[in-house]
Every structure is written in structure tokens, then in C-alpha cells.
């Protein structure tokens, strides 16, 4: 989808209301391609490690009759993957029709995709991390001869299609409006081979064979998600000499049907193919209204304010979630001030109050509460012809933050739970340095302290006060560099490096939950050959990831359980962890032909 966008804007902290319902950590605003005045076509293809093949075809009719333009894209990616059998087959499409005149812009978009990926969410143990990094237990079973086999269709198979219609209108020099309607259709399943599952799990009745009671069976199941998401968003913008005022809102509704099917079973006397052994329905509604104002107080001082109301409703009746009928009403105010000291220096301060509802997985893990956040941010920006610097200090104080526990549910999704009080305090710095006409340097660093306050944990049957613990998956240090050499417009070489510090996969500061720090360095080269013919240009590219072949583990999971059966009368808390290793050095080379 990124190849069909003209810009991606990442806003840190609590997202502005104009970008949607709002966010806690960051919000991403994606703007699809603008219309093209001239017709074009391009064909791209890349090949790389692990039998990776990526193909992309993109076109535009150009502006026809000064008003109409049609554009589109078809793409396909296939790969065997680094992990055993972790193959992927991804297809995507994008179609856009545009109408424009002096004051009107209408865009109709239809895009979507289909993915088939072999499951690989089980991870590996610490011992396997040392001796068998690519091992994948998904699909593994033992046949009647006692031999290990792998089920070939242990896959995630999902399709999604999006339709959007956008209408932008400029009414006069002061007013413009935007109205959009959208609909998303999703459907798909993941398929699993299961050994010796209990009949009771699937509503099957035990039976007797030759005097022996049969209560388990090998089977193949599919767990489906069939969903619809639709709604509208709208806004009106007023501009005057010193004031920009935006008023808007939206209404969205999601309907999801989660159900399971048995498509084969070794023993299933009272079951038919594709019998549903569970069928859960859920509905989520989301309505929001906001007003945002930016006011230029003086040549140096400007103010902004943003108030939003959100109403969220949940209805669910599943075995995993239980009976849910919750309604949340949130008021989210934001305010800030900016001071332009001179043409080089700019300072800002902002405050935001945000509330966020739990998601469906959170209901599967208990009775969650909504999160509440107070976000304070202070920043300085410096701009000169050869040096740009951005610094930001933030303090985010939470009540009932839904933090990752480190555990996974039975479909590989991460679990979260509420903690009472917590905070995230940090400093972010990024810069853009022009070292010479050909060399540029873009460093960045993020330092943070992320804590659960007065965290309690039950170990060996006793509740313990662990004090202030690190929040899971929150490294204290992240740093990056991009060094680029570009002697002319046709040739560019970049060296990219990233450091991620030590982090815990759980919230109890257990050494068994540690993900070690790592550094990854990548190399990128691009060369453009300009042509004076039917072919306008040929772009060649090469990418080497992890050029130093480092053993990197960027993610994993951590869990605990109480053992009360090994030694009757006592409770022992057992810890465990799984890891997702990343590939060593790998390559991707490609070419794009522009017509």
C-alpha cells in the first residue's frame, strides 16, 4: 500500500483529532497519491534471499479533459521466509478515480489484498536459539508410524477489500469541507492440525470402540473471522489571517463474526464437515466530534486547542469474551503554545488528555478497564541551511494502562492487562546534518524510563509488592543513524544502523524475560539511468540487511504459571519464554522501469 501513497506522517504522542479517533503512542496519517497531470506507467521487480520475489505494476491515465484521472497498482510478494516453512504469498491492488475542477476534488478508492502465510508464531526456546534458530513447531505432528510430519496447510488465509469516497470542496477563501464514506470487507481463517484434542472442546460425544472409550481425536480446524467495517468522517475548515478552525467528527461501526469449523477429524461420529463448534458475534460503534483551533497571537506566539468527544459501544456474546455490553464516553482535551524565538529557533509546550477503550483481545483476558493518559510535552526545534535539530521531552502519566503482559493467546496475539498507575518519561532527539554537498547525516536517539508503580505479583502463592517495575517491551535506549552519499541526482548510497537496548518481555523484572540489546546495520544503493525514448528511466536498487550478520532477537514472549500438582500442598511459580530470531545477512536487488 505504501507504493500508492504520496506521504506518510507520523505524529508522536497523543494524536490530533483531525487524524481520527486518537492514539496514545503515535498516529500515522497516510495520504494516497495525488492525481497526475501526465500519463505514466512503471514496472518494478525485486528478487532476494529466501526465494523472495516482489513485483509491482503501477499506472495513471494522466488528467483527461482537464478533470478526470484514473490510476492503479497491482502487486505480488512471495517468499519462503527465514524460519522453516514460514512462507508468504501476498497479493494487493489499488484503483483510484479522481475528478477535479477549480474548487472540487472527488476521489474514489478501491484497494485490498489477500495473504496466505504459514504460521510461525510459536517461537523457539533459549536452547533452540543457540542450536536451531529457524525451527518452527507449527504444523508438526506424529503419524501412525511414529514419524514427525508437518501439515502443509497450517496457514493464515485472509482477504480484505476497502472502498472509500472522498469529497473536498473549497467554498470561498475562508471555508473548505471534507466528507468521506468508507466500507471495509474482511474474511479469512487460520487452519491448524491438532493432535488428540478433547471431544468436549468441539461439542462432540465420546464413543466406545472394542470396549475402549474414545474421547480425543486428531483433527483439522479453521478459525474464521468474517467482518464488516463502515462509516463516515467529515470536517469543515475556516481560515482567516490569524485563525484556523477545524470542526468535524465521524461515525464508524464494526461487525465481526468469529467462528470455528472442523474440516476433518479422525474420529467424529456426530459431526459433519464444516460444523461450527463456536460462533461469536461482536459489534463496536464509535462516534466522535471535535473542534480544533490554531491562533496566531503575535508574530512569535501561537496557541492551539483541541477538544474531542468520543462515544464507544461494545456488544459481544462469545465464549472467549463472555457477554459484553459496555459503553464508554470520553472527553479528550488538548492545548499547546508555540514560541518562535527567531527564524532559527522554535519552542513548544503541549498538554493532552486521552482515553482509550480496551480491544476484543483484552476482553478475552478478563474484565478490562479503559486507559486514561495525561501527556505533557516540551520541545525545541532548530533550523538552519545545513543543520536541523528536533528535541522533545515527554511525561506520560497513565491510570489503568493496558500494558503487554508478555504472554500470547491461542492464536499468537499478545495479551494485555490493566496496571494501576504507570508512567513513561523520555527524551527524543533527531537531526539532519549536511556535512557537504554530497554527504548527509541523520542521527536520532530516544532515552526513556517506563515504569509500573507499586506493581504486585503473586509468586509461589504469595502476593508480593515488587515496587516500581519496568514496563514490558520498553527499552530505555533506542538510537539510529543514516549516512547518505549522493554525488548527483542519479546515484545514492546509504548506510543505516539501529541500536535497541535491553528490554523485558514481562512486567516483573525477571532475568528470564530479558531481550538482549542488539545493533543492526543495513546498506542501500540506488542508481537511475535516464533515457530519451519510450522508456523514461530505469531505477536500479540494492539492499543488504544486517550486513554484519548479527544474531538478532527483536521479539518474543514471556509467561508464568503456578504449579500446584508436582508437589501437592505447595505452589511453585514457573517461568517460561519464547523467542523470535531475525535473519542474518540477507539481500534484495530490484529494478523499476518508468514509461
Predicted regions, residues:
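Short acidic/polar hinge/loop motifs at secondary-structure boundaries
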Residues: 1-12, 31, 367
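Acidic/polar loop-and-plug regions of large Gram-negative outer-membrane beta-barrel proteins
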Residues: 98, 105-164, 191-219
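Structural signature of Gram-negative outer-membrane beta-barrels, strongest in the C-terminal barrel
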Residues: 102, 252, 277-398, 434-436, ...
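Gram-negative outer-membrane beta-barrel transporters
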Residues: 299, 395, 417-507, 594
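C-terminal beta-barrel architecture of Gram-negative outer-membrane proteins
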Residues: 79-80, 473-532, 548, 556-557
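Transmembrane beta-barrel wall of Gram-negative outer-membrane proteins
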Residues: 40, 47-78, 83-120, 166-172
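Membrane-embedded beta-barrel scaffold of Gram-negative outer-membrane proteins
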Residues: 170, 174-182, 340, 346-352, ...
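C-terminal beta-signal and adjacent terminal beta-strands/loops
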Residues: 399, 441, 449-451, 499-504, ...
Amino acid at each position: 500500500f505504501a507504493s500508492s501513497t504520496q506521504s506518510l506522517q507520523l505524529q508522536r504522542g497523543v494524536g490530533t483529532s483531525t487524524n481520527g479517533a486518537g492514539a496514545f503512542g503515535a498516529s500515522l496519517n497516510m495520504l494516497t497519491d495525488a492525481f497526475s497531470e501526465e500519463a505514466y506507467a512503471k514496472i518494478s521487480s525485486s528478487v532476494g534471499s529466501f526465494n523472495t520475489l516482489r513485483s509491482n505494476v503501477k499506472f495513471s491515465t494522466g488528467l483527461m479533459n482537464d478533470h478526470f484521472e484514473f490510476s492503479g497498482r497491482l502487486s505480488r510478494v512471495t517468499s519462503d521466509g527465514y524460519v522453516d516453512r514460514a512462507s508468504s504469498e501476498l497479493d494487493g491492488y489499488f484503483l483510484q478515480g479522481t475528478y477535479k475542477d477549480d474548487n472540487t476534488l472527488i476521489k474514489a478508492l478501491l484497494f485490498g489484498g489477500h495473504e496466505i502465510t504459514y504460521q510461525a508464531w510459536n517461537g523457539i526456546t533459549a536452547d533452540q536459539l543457540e542450536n536451531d534458530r529457524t525451527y518452527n513447531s507449527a504444523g508438526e505432528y506424529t503419524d501412525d508410524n511414529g514419524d514427525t510430519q508437518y501439515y502443509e496447510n497450517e496457514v493464515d488465509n485472509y482477504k480484505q477489500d476497502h472502498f472509500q469516497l472522498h469529497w473536498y470542496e473549497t467554498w470561498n477563501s475562508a471555508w473548505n469541507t471534507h466528507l468521506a464514506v468508507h466500507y471495509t470487507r474482511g474474511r479469512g481463517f487460520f487452519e491448524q492440525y491438532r493432535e488428540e484434542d478433547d471431544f468436549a472442546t468441539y461439542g462432540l460425544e465420546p464413543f466406545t470402540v472394542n470396549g475402549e472409550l474414545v474421547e480425543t481425536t486428531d483433527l483439522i480446524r479453521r478459525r474464521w473471522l468474517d467482518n464488516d467495517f463502515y462509516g463516515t468522517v467529515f470536517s469543515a475548515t475556516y481560515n482567516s489571517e490569524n485563525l484556523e478552525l477545524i470542526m468535524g467528527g465521524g461515525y464508524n461501526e464494526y461487525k465481526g463474526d468469529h467462528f470455528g469449523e472442523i474440516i476433518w477429524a479422525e474420529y467424529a461420529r456426530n459431526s459433519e464437515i464444516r460444523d461450527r463448534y463456536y460462533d461469536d458475534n461482536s459489534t463496536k460503534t464509535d462516534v466522535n466530534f471535535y473542534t480544533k483551533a490554531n491562533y496566531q497571537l503575535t508574530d512569535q506566539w501561537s496557541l492551539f486547542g483541541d477538544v474531542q468527544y468520543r462515544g464507544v459501544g461494545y456488544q459481544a456474546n462469545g465464549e472467549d469474551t463472555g457477554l459484553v455490553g459496555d459503553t464508554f464516553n470520553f472527553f479528550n482535551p488538548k492545548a499547546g503554545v508555540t514560541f518562535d524565538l527567531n527564524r532559527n529557533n522554535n519552542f513548544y509546550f503541549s498538554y493532552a488528555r486521552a482515553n482509550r477503550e480496551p480491544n476484543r483481545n483484552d476482553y478475552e483476558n478478563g474484565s478490562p478497564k479503559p486507559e486514561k493518559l495525561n501527556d505533557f510535552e516540551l520541545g525545541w526545534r532548530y533550523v538552519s541551511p545545513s543543520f536541523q535539530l528536533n528535541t522533545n521531552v515527554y511525561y506520560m502519566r497513565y491510570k489503568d494502562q493496558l500494558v503487554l503482559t508478555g504472554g500470547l493467546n491461542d492464536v499468537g496475539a499478545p495479551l494485555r492487562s490493566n496496571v494501576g498507575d504507570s508512567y513513561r518519561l523520555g527524551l527524543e532527539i533527531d537531526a539532519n546534518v549536511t556535512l557537504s554537498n554530497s554527504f548527509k547525516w541523520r542521527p536520532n536517539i530516544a532515552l526513556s524510563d517506563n515504569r509500573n508503580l507499586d506493581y504486585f505479583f503473586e509468586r509461589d502463592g504469595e502476593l508480593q509488592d515488587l515496587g516500581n517495575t519496568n514496563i514490558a517491551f520498553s527499552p530505555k535506549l533506542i538510537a539510529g543513524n543514516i549516512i547518505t552519499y549522493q554525488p548527483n541526482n542519479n546515484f545514492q548510497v546509504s548506510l543505516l544502523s539501529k541500536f535497541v537496548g535491553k528490554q523485558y518481555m514481562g512486567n516483573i523484572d525477571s532475568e528470564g524475560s530479558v531481550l538482549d540489546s542488539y545493533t543492526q546495520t543495513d546498506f542501500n544503493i540506488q542508481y537511475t539511468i535516464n533515457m530519451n525514448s519510450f522508456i523514461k528511466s530505469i531505477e536500479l536498487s540494492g539492499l543488504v540487511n544486517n550486513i554484519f550478520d548479527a544474531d538478532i532477537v527483536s521479539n518474543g514472549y514471556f509467561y508464568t504459571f503456578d504449579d500446584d500438582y508436582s508437589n501437592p500442598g505447595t505452589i511453585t511459580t514457573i517461568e517460561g519464554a519464547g523467542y523470535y530470531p531475525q535473519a542474518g545477512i540477507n539481500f534484495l536487488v530490484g529494478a523499476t522501469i518508468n514509461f
